[in-house]
């Protein structure tokens, strides 16, 4: 009798454990069945989705011409189409060999000082339009820092602190963990990856729009 009760208790406990496990895992991997477009669900990553908004993380290399094109053409179109329903953040992911990480450090420091988007635009322009893709020395950095409206002294002190380089390294590890194979690649709401041949304007718009449309149905 005692053994039977023990077995019943054990089964009940197991059932509760499995229910908790399912409730814990499902928010991280749940994706609406009618989500449109081409994408990959990263089952090991946690969803960061909040109703009515999509968080887009762009993994990009400042020296990558495709990343510059995405920043110059796709980003403005995405902002125009989705407005405040879309939050775009770039994460530096160096893939071009032989380039120093100074541009990535500058971007991270500017982010810390509230001017990340401005610095991103200036760096892409400097490298791809002004054709300055060599060493970003201190005098050039000062001009760019002033252009985005930041204090050069405070900026350089932040650069020397090591925080920007640590942020760059963390971003690189993140990209490697989710197996970013090319730039630009995007991560939507923490666990929906769009990359490679799927990084067409039409497909990116389709996936984002369908996420928001699914929210509207709820």
Predicted regions and their residues:
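Structural microenvironment flanking redox-active thiols in thiol-disulfide oxidoreductases
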Residues: 81-112, 117-145
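Extracytoplasmic/secreted envelope proteins and their assembly/folding machinery
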Residues: 72-79, 83, 103-107, 120, ...
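Solvent-exposed, acidic/flexible segments
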Residues: 52-53, 67-71, 96-103, 112-116, ...
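C-terminal cap of thioredoxin/glutaredoxin-like
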Residues: 3-4, 31, 146-218
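A short alpha-helix capping/helix-coil boundary motif
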Residues: 55-57, 84-87, 118-122, 149-152, ...
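Extracytoplasmic thiol/disulfide redox context detector
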Residues: 2-97, 172, 177, 213-218
